[in-house]
Amino acid sequence: MTDAAIPIHALASNDLAAWLEGAPSEVRAWVAAHDFKAKPGTHLVVPETGGGIAGVLAGLSEPTSLWDLASLAKTLPSGTYALAPTPAVSDADKAEALMLGWILGSYTFDKYRDAAPQPAKLTPPTGVDSARVEALAEAIYTVRDLVNTPANDMGPTELAAAAKGLADRFDASFDVTIGDALLDDNYPAIHAVGRAAKDSPRLIEMTWGDPDHPTVALVGKGVCFDSGGLDIKSATGMKWMKKDMGGAAHVLGIALAVMALKLKVYLKVLIPAVENAISGDAMRPMDVVRTRAGISIEIGNTDAEGRVILADALTRAGESNPEVVIDFATLTGAARVALGTELPALFCNDDTLANAVLVAGTNAEDALWRMPLWPGYRKMIEGKVAEITNSAEGGYAGAITAALFLERFAPKDVMAWNVSSKPGRPEGGEAMGLRAFVAALAERYGRA
């Protein structure tokens, strides 16, 4: 803690009495007058006699939560603060979590309005891995910024530019296949979904790391706006469809963290980026679309387009013989109905890896919930004139049938993860599952 920083005494309620025993009498009187009990989410500013701030008391959960101090960044007066030594934050991991929560609570998306007042700042606590905190925070900010940006400023072109900027920063190789070149290079499904839009469809590819390290492929759905296509959405359903590229945003956020932390992996990032638009060239219901894998898809619903573009991207990912494929996508409302808006669904075909991700998510307070790849539902995605359909009839098990669809295109004998989540929360875009996956990858492969 620096001399200029205002101390924050973060305390669980059962530690408050012991702390007060060593506090000056005027502080004890102030705490009593305000009936401060150190309940989670509460705080008390302790004044100096000269009118400044002597310190802040902040209540902690038991066990300590990442989010315990997150609101303080915007509720405390501007200035620099530091965690004072207390029993609850003596553990470096707990202090690190509190610092990350503080930074995440500082986030504001003000690209289109006057800048918000500068939030209060927290100096890194002693023993904290500041590089890891900063990498995770920047990764999450990146996801939030990308998802919050409206579609008129975040189409396939701009999404590719964001990926290119990340590649340049970390000396990763970058390639993009655009428009009719998708047909020339055998990505017909991506082309079919995106060809109706003015901003041409594309496949974004980024590669980073040592080829001698295990290959990890990240695949993210990049539907930059989803009108539903000819099976058009309602006004309510369409309103927040700028967030339908949340899977791509998550992949770029994870890639940023992986590269910043120098994980010992050979990273492959693939993002099929399209707008699902309406025009005379739009994909029609009951069209049959070919894929890079040679599997034919019957378009049961043009609003189930995300899995169609992911089919080509997953096939491409498998061509690099990865050890792990991780696929992030906002595929179905069914997952939201089943699990709500704060708990992403995890589909995984390997029990060991699924458990590793679930444990990492619990430890990082970034929980996921595993859903079954129930083989009995495969018949629900059988096509009538094509091999499979992108929209199972009947309306049942929508999240599972979407995952089973993607499983057809995942490389064989490779452990494949698929996360179906809702990246947009009421306050805007959010990174869900990112910290869990970064932690699981770091645990599995280590840092250079």
Task: Name each region found by the language model.
Residues 160-448:
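A generic structural signal for tightly packed, nonpolar segments enriched in small/aliphatic residues
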Residues 1-222:
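Short amphipathic alpha-helical segment within the helicase RecA-like ATPase core
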